[in-house]
Each structure stands twice: as structure tokens, then as C-alpha cells.
Amino acid sequence: MKERKKKYVALWQVMQRECRRLVSRPLYLFCMVIAPLFCYLFFTTLMDSGLPQNLPAGVVDMDDSSTSRNIVRNLDAFSQTGVVAHYSNVTDARIAVQEGKIYGFFYIPKGLSAEAQSQRQPKISFYTNYSYLIAGSLLFRDMKMMGELTAGSAARSVLYAKGATEDQAMGFLQPIVIDTHPLNNPWLNYSVYLCNTLIPGVLMLLIFMVTVYSIGVEIKDRTAREWLRMSNNSIYIALAGKLLPHTVVFFIMGIFYNVYLYGFLHFPCNSGIFPMIFATLCLVLASQCCGIVMIGTLPTLRLGLSFASLWGVISFSISGFSFPVMAMNPVLQGKCRKPYR
């Protein structure tokens, strides 16, 4: 009984010692409170609208007819596309894309209206800059849709001229109606997709770094013997007493981001808030365990922090966040089954 009481006393003393160290170094306050809060607000406000709106695009209208002007107006009506400039030729539009003034341009050839009415299949072209993946993809989608709508409108006019009714024309143009239902993120909101991964990922990375630093600085400052002696020469009590205050702080920060995302911003959460909070607690504990392994593998502060930062950054990529796991190399797919993420 006395031995157990000594363990509890030693654990409490180590926790008190660690709390004093936490409040004595501003670095802990920054990494455990200020940096997570900044990342929460930064990422959620950066993508506040969900999808980029009014991406700058250009138009090269060589036809300059009522039909071509109507096409340009309809293209500008898309929420993701904003027609900001008209160019007299393709060369000027290409230079504007290369200079970053626009992300793409829509080319309407001369004689479009006349060739469409005479059924000579005029060609509409559009060019998007895929160096910017999201902007290029959104503009490509809108311009492709505009091209399909233009072709459908021309075909519908021909069918009307041949005496077809509206139902007959629409049945010919679209024999099968597609009804799409995106699951879990029906708004196709980039903020929902990115913040659900980035925010816990950043928190995980900070836990790695703080755990490695808090143990590594004991080795660097030669206070590890004092720390171990205070814990009754038990490495388990030493680690538990040192990391429990960190666990409490990081868990509170985890609860905050869950309430912020799913309660305040109303992100979709099919499981409910309490399973997510429990998963956050598991994330905090697992990240601290990884931090212990990192500083134990490379027991110097510099190498331990380098290991933690490298592992954390690689975890983003290999978890399938930026590239689908099923499309990776089979060797990497096997590694994704392991708890890198």
C-alpha cells in the first residue's frame, strides 16, 4: 500500500514539475494553444465560401454575333467563372494566361452562328491553366458545360425547325436523365474536405513536436536524471507525469476544434459529436506515443525534431489526403494500411 502511495505521490510531483515548466517557457504556450487556434481560424476562414468564386477567365470572340454574346453572358453567369477580359486574338489570351491574369479563356471562332444554323459543325475551343489544379479544374468544368449547352441549344433549334415538340426535342437531346447525389459532402465544399483533414493533421504534427521537444530538452539541459529521480526511478511514472498535462491541454484543443467545426460551422458529422471527441482523445494519445518512439529512436533534440517533422509531413501524403490510396503503387498501398496516419 505504501509503495502504491509513493507512486501516486511521485506521479503528482512530476506533473507539478511539468506544469511549472509549461508556464515558464512561452514556446509551450505558442505550440499548444496559439498555433492550433491560429490554424483553426486560418484554414476555415481561408475557404469560407467553400468553393472559389468568380475565377478570372477571358474570351476570344471572333464571331461577335448575338449568339456568341449570349454564350459569353451565360458563361459569366456560372458562379465559379468570371469573364474579366475580351481579347482580339488567341496570342493575347495565351500571354494573359502565362502572366497569371486569367486561368483560362474561351475561344469562339468566326462564323459560329452561320455554321451552326447551316449544320456545318463549328468548333468551340477552351483552354485552362492546369498549373493551378483547383482553378483549372473548376474553369474546365464550367467551360465544358457551356460548350455542351451551346451544342444542345443549336440542336434543339434545328429540331424545333423540323416541327418537333419540346418534349420530343428534349427526349432526343437527353434520352437518359442523370440524377447525381454526392454523399457526405453534397455541397462539394472544399472547406469540408480539407479542414476535416488539415486541422487534426496540424494538431497531430504539433503533438509530435511538443512531445519530442519536452523529452529532448531534458536530455539537452541534463535534467533527465532529476526528472527520473523525482519519478521514483520509474520511466513509466516519468513519462506519464510529464505527458499528462500535455494530454489535457491538447485534448481541450481537440474538443474545441470539434465543437467549432461540427457545432458552430455545421460541418456534416454522421457519427455524432461524442464519438468524434473520443476519436480525438485517441489521436492525442497515439500522437504522444509516436513522439516518445521518435525521441527514443533518435535521442537528441535536433534529430528528434527533424524526425517528427518529416514523419508528420509524409503522413499527410501517404494517408490518401492528396492522392487516392487505391491509385498508389502497391507497395505504398500496403504501407497505408499501417498507422502512419
What do the PLM-derived regions correspond to, one by one?
Residues 1-192:
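Extracytoplasmic/periplasmic domains immediately adjacent to an N-terminal transmembrane anchor
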Residues 17, 21-24, 185-194, 230-242, ...:
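Membrane-helix interfacial "entry" motifs
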Residues 43, 64, 95, 248, ...:
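Membrane-spanning alpha-helical segments of multipass transporters and channels
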